[in-house]
């Protein structure tokens, strides 16, 4: 939503850490890897530690739809979870409909500072689907580009203490395809304005006709703007289209 400066996204949250306390001997257990599937097994059966990640810039929704936890014999833990969320991110629409946006989702670990838990980017599990069958396409936008990074920052608490937190930032760079907006709003308004300018080439003695054309042009542009106002972003500052 451009008016609320929010965006909706779906994705897979993948994490990997090592906990030697969870190591086991396959010859004793009889299995090579240990799996916990679904929230019942994860919440009720799994007894190890895991980083509880939350969306710091959440704006109205963060749903967890499926989870798989895999533990290898040496204590490596692989956490995979499907998520759907709405995040708050700054929109700059001054160049609408030729604008570009940087949408960011910021994840943090609940209850731990960077001295205890440090987040790192894993290039092997970070990316966006780009094949023909699963390619991400957004109406009125060109194909998005994804990047990720770790941000370190220090919040100040009311008792004067400075904290040190680590956050995982996922950034989606998108560029708007202006053709729909120009075809629907931009080009028709330009034609109406040009027709209104035709009064300057009319006979000077035809004052009444010139006034009629001018008022008709103004009313047509205003009516057209009102008719298609729902297709334009509801923001207070001006854009290229007005």
Predicted feature residues:
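Soluble non-transmembrane domains of integral membrane proteins
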Residues: 1-169
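Channel- or pocket-lining gating/hinge segments that regulate access to a cavity or pore
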Residues: 169-242
